[in-house]
């Protein structure tokens, strides 16, 4: 208590740069003035943050990029000493929390919560002692172009505010599918920011629809599978997630995991916690060995409740990190060291996880009484919730998850130098690599594609590759000068695998970066009759092929089919002529 009082007085002296203490009435947000009916536009939002910066040396505003429509991607840095670099802040022994709002700009809860949370610290001195141990980065509006596409019809089933932005960007991209492929200029700027600051905690604020329940807020932390390193996964469960639930319940906003049910609209049938891959925000943090919290506020709850609950989640998270920062920093360092070690690669890395029935726990789930009636409008069964009758259900929560798809990590990847767009992504994701200065012969494991299944619909402006089939073999190949060598003895080695492995969900193969080799379009301009000459030549030169041909000729049907005979040689020549057409350009150096 004494430390908190002293910290508050010191910060008050530091943060107020004008002669008189600001009038608190001047810092009521536009959202509060409207009784949480309205949310401000981008210009008004940043003007408010600038107003706080004008009276506090702890608040700095900068830009980390520009949107396609030319708007600033604004970043608000809050540090007790006014520091503006991660190195300087960490030298002071503080941890960093990145709070991102409006990645889907029709979901503005985090933006208004950030304004009020920071105002309460700077102007009202509430929880000001948090700044002794924590510095904050706020992105008030990530999808800034979508945010300015204001309309009352963008999310008609959402309970406020009355006008808001759109889910997608001006380029019609969903930023929360873009963390790996980074098609959007906004995301490319964000990746540079994130990989420079590497915040200990990243909070991404959303609003969800779907199931109906009493909770104002649900959440996700990708710690059910093995995406998060085991030591950090345990820390996130035993300390962060446990205390977050306790603290939110104490302030009147109990929370629950972002979940689905075994049967539609029936939590009592079993609650399943979905796992995600690093194309999504909280999972991108997890694969970096950092905490990622996805907040999914409930779309049917009043906007005021959602904003106030979000503020409490910010405070609770910051308090947990402030009180446990030494153990968190140590755990993260150990996680980075572990995933960069040869020991980590002794076991396959899971890519897909699925819940299994062998373990579950009974939990209380705050729901509503419901009944099913025959709709007089559509004739369908209509499930209706009775908001006058809150109920607590005892439900099984599945706690066991097993990997259903895995890959053995190599010692290194070798990527051919002509794949410049992929190499650019390695830089954006801060994946370290070296380049060969001259050609080098190496024994590598390769993938050769034999079949690909493409989506019949576009996604994010791309045609996803839903499934690939390929052979795996060891080959001795000459790697050309300029080839990129990605040593897996680095914390971001796992991220390289998520990008380059064909079977990884959300990989660059999935998004079509390698379509030229997944399904080669090169034509083989040799006519079948030429095989009359070439076949004889091959039989003279290649004893193994001659033996194979003679074995085939024992089949009477084959021996009588002149086209099949010529095609036998045709396929042999085609395979030799275009032996690299279906070769995946990321080769694997195995132990």
Can you name each region flagged by the protein language model?
Residues 1-6:
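Bacterial N-terminal signal peptides that target proteins for export
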Residues 14-17:
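C-terminal motif of bacterial Sec signal peptides marking the signal peptidase cleavage site
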Residues 22-37, 99-101, 174, 227, ...:
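Acidic/histidine-rich, surface-exposed loop or edge segments in extracytoplasmic proteins
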Residues 43-97, 124:
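Soluble metallo-hydrolase cores and metallopeptidase-like ectodomains found primarily
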Residues 91-100, 108-267, 273-276:
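Active-site/substrate-binding loop(s) of hydrolase catalytic cores
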Residues 261-444, 448-449:
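Hard-cation-handling environments
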Residues 372-526, 531-534:
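Feature captures C-terminal
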Residues 492-494, 500-591:
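Accessory, solvent-exposed terminal regions and/or long lumenal/extracellular loops of proteins
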């Amino acid at each position: 208590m004494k430390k908190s009082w002293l910290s508050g007085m010191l910060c008050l002296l530091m943060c107020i740069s004008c002669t008189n203490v600001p009038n608190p009435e001047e810092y009521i947000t536009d959202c509060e003035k409207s009784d949480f009916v309205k949310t401000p536009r981008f210009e008004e939002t940043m003007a408010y943050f600038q107003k706080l910066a004008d009276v506090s040396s702890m608040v700095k505003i900068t830009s980390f990029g520009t949107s396609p429509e030319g708007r600033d991607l604004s970043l608000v840095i809050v540090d007790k000493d006014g520091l503006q670099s991660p190195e300087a802040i960490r030298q002071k022994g503080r941890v960093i929390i990145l709070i991102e709002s409006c990645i889907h700009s029709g979901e503005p809860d985090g933006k208004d919560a950030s304004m009020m949370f920071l105002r309460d610290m700077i102007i009202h001195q509430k929880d000001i002692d948090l700044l002794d141990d924590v510095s904050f980065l706020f992105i008030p509006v990530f999808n800034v172009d979508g945010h300015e596409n204001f309309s009352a019809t963008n999310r008609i089933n959402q309970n406020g505010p009355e006008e808001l932005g759109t889910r997608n960007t001006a380029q019609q991209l969903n930023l929360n599918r873009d963390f790996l492929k980074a098609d959007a200029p906004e995301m490319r700027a964000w990746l540079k920011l994130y990989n420079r600051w590497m915040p200990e905690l990243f909070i991404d604020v959303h609003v969800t629809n779907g199931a109906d329940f009493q909770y104002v807020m649900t959440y996700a932390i990708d710690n059910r599978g093995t995406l998060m390193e085991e030591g950090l996964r345990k820390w996130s469960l035993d300390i962060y997630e446990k205390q977050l639930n306790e603290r939110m319940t104490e302030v009147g906003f109990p929370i629950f995991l972002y979940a689905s049910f075994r049967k539609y609209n029936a939590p009592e049938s079993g609650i399943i916690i979905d796992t995600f891959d690093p194309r999504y925000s909280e999972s991108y943090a997890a694969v970096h060995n950092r905490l990622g919290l996805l907040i999914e506020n409930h779309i049917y709850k009043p906007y005021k409740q959602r904003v106030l609950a979000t503020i409490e989640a910010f405070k609770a998270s910051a308090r947990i990190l402030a009180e446990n920062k030494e153990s968190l920093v140590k755990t993260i360092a150990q996680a980075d060291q572990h995933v960069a070690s040869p020991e980590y690669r002794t076991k396959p890395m899971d890519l897909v996880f699925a819940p299994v029935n062998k373990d579950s726990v009974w939990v209380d789930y705050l729901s509503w009484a419901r009944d099913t009636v025959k709709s007089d409008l559509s004739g369908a069964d209509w499930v209706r919730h009775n908001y006058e009758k809150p109920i607590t259900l005892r439900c099984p929560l599945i706690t066991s998850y097993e990997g259903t798809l895995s890959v053995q990590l190599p010692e290194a990847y070798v990527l051919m130098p002509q794949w410049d767009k992929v190499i650019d992504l390695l830089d954006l994701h801060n994946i370290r690599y070296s380049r060969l200065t001259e050609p080098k012969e190496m024994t590598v494991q390769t993938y050769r594609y034999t079949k690909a299944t493409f989506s019949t619909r576009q996604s994010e402006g791309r045609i996803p590759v839903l499934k690939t089939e390929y052979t795996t073999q060891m080959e001795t190949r000459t790697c050309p000068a300029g080839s990129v060598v990605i040593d897996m003895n680095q914390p971001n080695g796992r991220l390289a695998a998520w990008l380059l492995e064909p079977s990884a969900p959300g990989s660059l193969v999935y998004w079509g970066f390698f379509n030229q080799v997944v399904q080669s379009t090169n034509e083989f301009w040799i006519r079948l009759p030429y095989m009359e000459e070439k076949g004889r030549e091959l039989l003279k030169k290649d004893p193994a092929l001659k033996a194979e041909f003679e074995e085939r000729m024992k089949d009477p049907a084959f021996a009588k089919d002149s086209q099949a005979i010529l095609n036998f040689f045709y396929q042999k020549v085609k395979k030799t002529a275009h032996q690299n057409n279906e070769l995946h350009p990321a080769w694997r150096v195995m132990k």
